[in-house]
Curated annotation (Swiss-Prot):
Protein name: Protein arginine N-methyltransferase 5
Gene: csul
Source organism of this protein record: Drosophila melanogaster (Fruit fly)
Family to which this protein belongs: Belongs to the class I-like SAM-binding methyltransferase superfamily. Protein arginine N-methyltransferase family.
Tissue: Expressed only in ovaries.
BP GO annotations: intracellular mRNA localization; P granule organization; peptidyl-arginine methylation; pole plasm assembly; pole plasm protein localization; regulation of DNA-templated transcription
Superkingdom of the source species: Eukaryota
Residues the record lists as binding S-adenosyl-L-methionine: Y300, K309, Y310, E368, D396, M397
Database matches in InterPro entries: Arg_MeTrfase (IPR025799), Arg_MeTrfase_PRMT5 (IPR007857), PRMT5 (IPR035075), PRMT5_C (IPR035248), PRMT5_TIM (IPR035247), SAM-dependent_MTases_sf (IPR029063)
Biological role: Arginine methyltransferase that can both catalyze the formation of omega-N monomethylarginine (MMA) and symmetrical dimethylarginine (sDMA). Specifically mediates the symmetrical dimethylation of arginine residues in the small nuclear ribonucleoproteins SmD1 and SmD3. Required for arginine symmetrical dimethylation of piwi family proteins, piwi, aub and AGO3, during germline development. Required during oogenesis for pole cell formation in the pathway controlled by oskar (osk) and for abdominal segments during early embryogenesis. Involved in nanos (nos) and germ cell mRNAs localization.
Source lineage: Eukaryota, Metazoa, Ecdysozoa, Arthropoda, Hexapoda
Binding site for a protein: F303, E412, E421
Length: 610
């Protein structure tokens, strides 16, 4: 994704000249009042200030963001409100004439925005060919800054201003406009009040179009160059990391325009994610089902580019070999390693590397059910591993009868939620392959959940509704525009080998979470960690994520949106259900007496086929 850096100036005499000045100073978009030259606030002005022909149609759409007249369509005064609405609708009509798919920016003045919301709702319906509406919101209530200069402010006044949170202004409008993908938020920073970390984190879960940085936020460094203070650098960096564009707001006579643009372009370069998988951000994907579907070579290739995972598997096998075979037995004792699912060979390489590093003798059995993967593995046996004691079997591990039992059983059957690729069922079925004192790598997996706010993910779920029951699915997603309402907590645990007399892989658990700030619940995040051997672990739990590992994206279980209040406790109940043909999850927010929708009953949406 390419970012834009926008120059915002009011009171300009010429939009083409503003564009020329902006582009000469390394900006690629401009923002200014739709009423350049200060058109009087008369709804039926007969003398327009500029014609449509001063720019081409493509330039109107790609280079200009219009700010609407600063009128209050929600004024408590009837006459002022009606007059404001006429002016506002005149501006909207002019903008639609100039920009059939352009961008309009309107400022929220306070919590009362019902009329504005109804206008935006009408203009953003699916059958209406409009562009985007950018809702400009201060990151904190501007009223709070005034108390720093007032000695007469009472505690009640301060508390009231703190409770009048601009996020709620935005949220109320967003709810009325039904989470429209055409309605995005533009967050205005201010030099009078720096937001808390939790405030910033919450905004990251919103569909952010841009942040506005006023020129007053810049300071001169020792080289007399315009920069942001360290605290603001960090805040701006967080927004850049979720693809927020930058709008620099200045007065028309500012002489440091180029310095501002160059500086924020450097911030963008320093903070944007250049990872090879960033094109998957916020995409919803149906989880793989490798037990019943054969993976293609592209999928294998993506997994194999993760060096961290296979290095940790190698470390685990290495440690197990050292524990299993003493130095005195190294040249004589053979360790049988059984690999459940060979893919294109990365785990086999990890086993051979571990054997070489420990100087232990191994015999490797590779059990792989994918006939296409077998072809690649067979070629590797002939060309790369001709000197190895390795044997390939084209079998389902649950139906395989081994020539001998394994000392170490290695598998890579974990999904984004730990057990969602049916590792318990697979490893239970493969238990007969392992010696009574054999080692399973991994030997334990734990799933985790937490409540999430993500307007972008919710919008993506809603776009799938016409085709299938999208709120009854769990998705794999590279979570980007999210707010963690509370930290993840452990859900289900599975231990291997499971030698219980009656194995039951169904589960049910209720987990409670605290709401730290007013927000909206859009769904449930799902993660896992696994212990490979002893203290060697892999994790995608945000609290303990294995550095540099990207083989697994988290899961996202959708819910209907609900506004939550600071201090509230919510409980989430999760089920893992099993029948003769499938495994599935069900989930529900259980806040008595107002239990929310029960999702994926009987696995009618997302399920894993046995």
């Amino acid at each position: 994704m390419n970012y834009y850096v926008c120059l915002h100036q009011e009171g300009v005499n010429s939009i083409p000249k503003l564009i020329e000045k902006a582009f000469a100073n390394n900006y690629n978009v401009v923002s200014t009042s739709i009423n350049a030259n200060m058109l009087p606030f008369e709804p039926h002005e007969s003398d327009p200030t500029y014609p449509a022909t001063i720019l081409s149609g493509s330039d109107w759409n790609s280079k200009v963001i219009f700010t609407m007249s600063d009128v209050n369509v929600d004024s408590p005064n009837d006459k002022l409100r009606e007059h404001a609405k006429e002016v506002f609708m005149r501006d909207v009509a002019w903008a639609e004439h100039l920009q059939n798919v352009g961008n309009l920016m309107v400022r929220l003045r306070g919590p009362e925005n019902e009329n504005l919301a109804s206008i935006v709702l009408a203009k953003t319906k699916d059958d209406f060919p409009s562009g985007n509406w950018f809702i400009q919101v201060p990151i904190t209530n501007p009223e709070l800054a005034t108390f720093e200069h007032r000695k007469d402010a009472t505690a009640e006044e301060v508390a009231e201003a703190e409770s009048n949170d601009p996020w709620n202004w935005w949220n109320n409008l967003r709810m009325v406009t039904k989470h429209s993908t055409k309605v995005k938020v533009v967050i205005e920073l201010n030099d009078a009040d720096r937001p808390s970390k939790e405030t910033v984190r919450r905004w990251l879960g919103e569909p952010i179009e841009a942040i506005i940085i006023p020129s007053s936020l810049f300071v001169r460094n020792r080289s007399n160059y315009c920069v942001l203070k360290k605290e603001w650098q960090l805040i701006v960096g967080h927004f850049i990391s979720v693809r927020a564009n930058i709008i620099i707001s200045t007065n028309p006579n500012d002489k440091a325009l180029c310095q501002y643009a160059d500086y924020v372009n450097k911030l963008i370069n320093d903070n944007c994610d250049k990872h090879m998988l960033n094109s998957y951000e916020n995409m919803l994907e149906i989880p793989l089902q490798p037990l019943c579907d054969n993976l293609d070579t592209y999928t294998y290739e993506v997994f194999e580019t993760d060096p961290v995972k296979y290095k940790l598997y190698q470390d685990a096998v290495q440690a197990a070999l050292l524990d299993r075979v003493s130095a005195a037995e190294a040249k004589t004792k053979l360790t049988v390693v059984m690999l459940l699912g060979g893919g294109r060979g990365p785990l086999a390489r990890a086993v051979f590397n571990a054997a070489e590093l420990t100087k232990r003798k191994v015999r490797l059995y590779i059990i792989e059910k994918n006939p296409n993967a077998i072809r690649t593995l067979s070629n590797m046996v002939k060309t790369l591993w001709a000197d190895k004691d390795v044997h390939i079997f084209s079998k389902d591990m649950r139906d395989f009868s081994p020539p001998e039992l394994a000392d170490i059983m290695v598998s890579e059957l974990l999904g984004s939620f730990g057990d969602n690729e049916l590792s318990p069922e697979c490893l239970d079925g493969a238990l007969k392959l392992l010696k009574p004192d054999g080692i399973s790598i991994p030997y334990k997996s734990t799933s985790y959940i937490n409540p999430l706010m993500s307007a972008v993910l919710h919008q993506n779920v809603c776009q799938l509704l016409p085709t299938y029951p999208a709120f009854d699915y769990g998705y794999v997603s590279l979570l980007k525009n999210i707010y963690h309402i509370d930290e993840p907590q452990a859900l289900f645990e599975f231990v291997h080998p499971n030698r219980a007399e009656n194995i039951d892989n169904t589960r049910c658990k209720t987990v409670s979470f605290k709401v730290n700030k007013d927000c909206v619940l859009h769904g449930i995040g799902g993660y896992f960690d696994t212990h490979l051997y002893k203290d060697i672990c892999l994790s995608i739990n945000p609290l303990t994520h294995t550095p540099g590992m990207f083989s697994w994206f988290p899961m996202f279980f959708a819910t209907r949106p609900r506004t939550l209040r600071e201090g509230q406790t919510i409980s989430i109940q999760f089920w893992r259900c099993v029948d003769a043909t499938k495994v599935w999850y069900e989930w529900q927010v259980v806040n008595s007496p107002d239990d929310w929708e029960h999702h994926n009953t009987r696995g009618t949406g997302y399920n894993m086929r046995l």
